[in-house]
Amino acid sequence: MKCPFCGHSNTQVLDTRMSEDGDAVRRRRRCEACDRRFTTYERIELFFPAIVKKNGSRVDYTRAKLKDSMRLALRKRPVSAEAIDEAITRIEEKLLALGEKEIPSSQVGELVMRELRKLDKIAYIRFASVYRSFEDVSEFRDVLDEFAASTPRKG
């Protein structure tokens, strides 16, 4: 393993254990040249389906892009980074369970909207307004009416 600090290729493994969530092997290493320590993780390589965009082009799935779009919708909302990561993991599990080589971006968008609806209704509306290309206020009103009908009143 190449040292991230000096680039030397010889490192010594000091400790090996399973990560807390059990999906990776965590290794603590020491560079034999500069003596600095660092941690590496080994994970199973998963093959996600390619995403087919509206214009027909295909792009590789990236967790970072999904996370960025969700974080944008959740900006300044009271939702923890952990809750976002858990939602992304649920989306990824659904994508893998499909067993497809390609899926339309619209299907990913619907999965994101389901998770955002559970996390934060304002974030859901933000995402839906862009994803569904809302043109006027009536489309926002339709979503708000949908929430009002599905939410029990307090009191």
From Swiss-Prot:
<dbReference type="InterPro" id="IPR055173">
    <property type="entry name" value="NrdR-like_N"/>
</dbReference>
<protein>
    <recommendedName>
        <fullName>Transcriptional repressor NrdR</fullName>
    </recommendedName>
</protein>
<dbReference type="InterPro" id="IPR003796">
    <property type="entry name" value="RNR_NrdR-like"/>
</dbReference>
<keyword id="KW-0805">Transcription regulation</keyword>
<keyword id="KW-0804">Transcription</keyword>
<feature type="domain" description="ATP-cone">
    <location>
        <begin position="49"/>
        <end position="139"/>
    </location>
</feature>
<keyword id="KW-0067">ATP-binding</keyword>
<dbReference type="Pfam" id="PF22811">
    <property type="entry name" value="Zn_ribbon_NrdR"/>
</dbReference>
<keyword id="KW-0479">Metal-binding</keyword>
<keyword id="KW-0547">Nucleotide-binding</keyword>
<keyword id="KW-0862">Zinc</keyword>
<keyword id="KW-0678">Repressor</keyword>
<keyword id="KW-0863">Zinc-finger</keyword>
<dbReference type="Pfam" id="PF03477">
    <property type="entry name" value="ATP-cone"/>
</dbReference>
<dbReference type="GO" id="GO:0003677">
    <property type="term" value="F:DNA binding"/>
</dbReference>
<dbReference type="GO" id="GO:0045892">
    <property type="term" value="P:negative regulation of DNA-templated transcription"/>
</dbReference>
<dbReference type="InterPro" id="IPR005144">
    <property type="entry name" value="ATP-cone_dom"/>
</dbReference>
<dbReference type="GO" id="GO:0008270">
    <property type="term" value="F:zinc ion binding"/>
</dbReference>
<feature type="zinc finger region">
    <location>
        <begin position="3"/>
        <end position="34"/>
    </location>
</feature>
<dbReference type="GO" id="GO:0005524">
    <property type="term" value="F:ATP binding"/>
</dbReference>
<keyword id="KW-0238">DNA-binding</keyword>
<comment type="similarity">
    <text>Belongs to the NrdR family.</text>
</comment>
<comment type="function">
    <text>Negatively regulates transcription of bacterial ribonucleotide reductase nrd genes and operons by binding to NrdR-boxes.</text>
</comment>
